[in-house]
C-alpha cells in the first residue's frame, strides 16, 4: 500500500512516488554497490541531484560501498531510464515529471509503471533567462515582446518538451493571455547548448531551473528576469518573482529517485531506510541550502 501511495503523490503533483502497507522486511538484502543514473549530461539538473546523493551517502557513511554516477544522455531522459529498467536493485535513477509527460506526449513508451518509485527528494524553482546583451530588462517586457511577435520569438528548452522547464513557461504564457500552442520552442540537448544559442542570438529567451542558471548568471553571461517562487529567494534577492511582476504563477520543479520495476520488498525497504537517513543528514541539508533547493522528501512508505 505504501508503494501505491507514493505513486499517487507522484501523479497528483505532476510527479512520480507510491501507495504500500506496512510489512515486515526480514530477508537480508545483498547490495554491494550503488549506481545512480543521471539521464543527462554532467552539470545538468538530474546530474546535480545524482552527485548530491553520491556525496552525501559517502560523506555521512550512510552507504559505505562503492557509489558511481552514470550519465546516460538522450531521448529527454528515455535513454537513461531504459538502461535503469533493465538493471537490478543496485541501480537507481533520478527522475522528474518528464517520465510521465514523455509518455503522454507520445515521445516514449515508458511509464511510471515500468519502475519502482522510491522517493521525492527536493525541489527547485524555474526561471526565464535572456542573454546579457538582450534589450529585455524584465518579465513584462519579455511577455509583451513575445505576445506581439510570437512567430519570431524563439524560446529554448532542454532536454525536451513536456518537462517542468517547458510546462512552467506554458503556464506563464497562459496567465499572460498567450496561447501556448503558438509559441516557438527550440529543444536543445542540455543547458550549455541553450546558453550558446542565447549568446549567438539563435533564441530570444530560455526557461530552466534556477540551479542550472545560477552559475551563468553570476558570471554575467545571462540575465534572470523572473523566478517561479512565491517570494524572492534569500540567496538571490535581486531576482523578482513572476507574481510581483503581475503574472500570478508559482511553479515548483521536483526531483525524485526510482529503481527497476521488479525490485523486491526488501530492496525497497532497504533503500527507503538509506534515503531517509540521507535527507535527514547535515550534508544533504547543506547541499539544499547551497543550491537553493527546497526539501521535498516523501518516501515510498
Residue ranges: model-predicted function:
Residues 1-33:
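Short, low-complexity disordered leader/linker segments with a strong preference
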Residues 21-114, 161, 178-204, 297-298:
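N-terminal (or domain-start) structured segment
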Residues 30, 83-91, 104-193, 255-287:
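Hinge/capping helix and adjacent helix->loop/strand transition within the periplasmic-binding protein
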Residues 46-64, 166-175, 216, 283, ...:
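Short, polar/charged alpha-helical segment
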Residues 97-99, 123, 133, 211-212, ...:
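Solvent-exposed coil/turn segments that connect beta secondary-structure elements
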Residues 154, 289-301:
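Surface-exposed aromatic
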Residues 157-239:
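Ligand-binding pocket segment of bilobal, Venus flytrap-like solute-binding proteins
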Residues 212-282, 286, 291:
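C-terminal lobe and pocket-closing loops
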Amino acid at each position: 500500500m505504501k508503494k501505491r501511495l507514493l505513486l499517487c503523490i507522484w501523479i497528483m503533483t505532476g510527479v512520480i512516488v507510491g501507495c504500500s502497507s506496512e510489512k515486515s522486511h526480514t530477508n537480508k538484502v545483498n547490495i554491494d554497490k550503488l549506481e545512480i543514473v543521471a539521464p543527462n549530461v554532467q552539470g545538468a539538473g538530474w546530474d546535480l541531484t545524482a552527485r548530491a546523493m553520491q556525496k552525501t551517502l559517502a560523506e555521512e557513511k550512510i552507504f559505505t560501498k562503492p557509489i558511481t554516477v552514470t550519465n546516460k544522455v538522450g531521448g529527454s531522459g528515455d535513454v537513461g531510464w531504459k538502461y535503469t529498467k533493465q538493471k537490478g536493485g543496485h541501480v537507481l535513477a533520478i527522475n522528474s515529471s518528464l517520465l510521465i509527460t514523455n509518455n503522454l506526449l507520445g515521445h516514449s513508451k515508458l511509464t511510471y509503471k515500468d519502475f519502482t518509485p522510491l522517493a521525492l527528494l527536493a525541489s527547485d524553482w524555474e526561471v526565464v533567462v535572456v542573454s546579457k546583451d538582450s534589450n529585455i530588462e524584465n518579465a513584462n517586457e519579455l511577455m509583451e515582446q513575445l505576445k506581439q511577435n510570437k512567430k519570431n520569438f524563439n524560446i529554448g528548452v532542454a532536454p525536451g518538451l513536456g518537462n517542468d522547464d517547458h510546462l512552467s513557461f506554458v503556464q506563464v504564457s497562459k496567465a499572460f493571455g498567450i496561447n501556448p500552442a503558438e509559441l516557438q520552442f527550440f529543444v536543445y540537448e542540455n543547458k550549455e547548448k541553450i546558453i550558446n544559442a542565447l549568446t549567438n542570438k539563435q533564441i530570444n529567451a530560455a526557461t530552466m531551473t534556477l540551479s542550472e542558471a545560477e552559475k551563468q548568471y553570476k558570471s554575467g553571461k545571462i540575465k534572470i528576469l523572473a523566478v517561479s517562487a512565491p517570494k524572492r529567494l534569500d540567496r538571490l534577492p535581486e531576482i523578482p518573482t513572476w507574481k510581483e511582476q503581475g503574472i500570478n504563477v508559482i511553479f515548483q520543479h521536483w526531483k525524485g529517485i526510482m529503481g527497476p520495476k521488479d525490485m523486491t520488498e526488501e530492496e525497497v525497504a532497504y533503500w527507503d531506510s538509506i534515503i531517509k537517513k540521507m535527507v535527514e543528514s547535515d550534508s544533504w541539508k547543506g547541499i539544499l541550502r547551497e543550491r537553493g533547493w527546497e526539501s521535498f522528501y516523501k518516501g515510498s512508505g
